[in-house]
Each structure stands twice: as C-alpha cells, then as structure tokens.
Amino acid sequence: MVEPLLSGIVLGLIPVTLFGLLVAAYLQYRRGNQFGL
C-alpha cells in the first residue's frame, strides 16, 4: 500500500522541482541582465 503513495509523491514532486529550477534560472538570468553582464 506504500508504493502508490510513493509514486504519487514522486510524480507530484518532479513537475514542482522542474518548475522551481526554471524560475530560479529565469530570475538569475534577469538579474544578470540588470547588472549588464
């Protein structure tokens, strides 16, 4: 009974992690542009 819950958590975490990395990269890119690098 643990596997469905674990797979659900993993499937829920993967998109959130990818979205977080995308936002972090976007903010870092904008911050770099503001400093004129």
Swiss-Prot record:
Topology within the bilayer: Single-pass membrane protein
GO molecular function, one term: electron transporter, transferring electrons within cytochrome b6/f complex of photosystem II activity
Keyword annotations from UniProtKB, A to Z: Chloroplast, Electron transport, Membrane, Photosynthesis, Plastid, Thylakoid, Transmembrane, Transmembrane helix, Transport
Localization, UniProt: Plastid, Chloroplast thylakoid membrane
Transmembrane segments: 5-25
GO biological process, alphabetically ordered: cytochrome complex assembly; photosynthesis
GO cellular component: chloroplast thylakoid membrane; cytochrome b6f complex
Pfam families registered for this protein in UniProt: PetG
Paired cysteines (S-S): none
Summary of subunit composition and partner proteins: The 4 large subunits of the cytochrome b6-f complex are cytochrome b6, subunit IV (17 kDa polypeptide, PetD), cytochrome f and the Rieske protein, while the 4 small subunits are PetG, PetL, PetM and PetN. The complex functions as a dimer.
NCBIfam families: PRK00665.1 (NF001907)
Function: Component of the cytochrome b6-f complex, which mediates electron transfer between photosystem II (PSII) and photosystem I (PSI), cyclic electron flow around PSI, and state transitions. PetG is required for either the stability or assembly of the cytochrome b6-f complex.
Family: Belongs to the PetG family.
Protein name: Cytochrome b6-f complex subunit 5
Organism: Gracilaria tenuistipitata var. liui
Gene name as annotated: petG
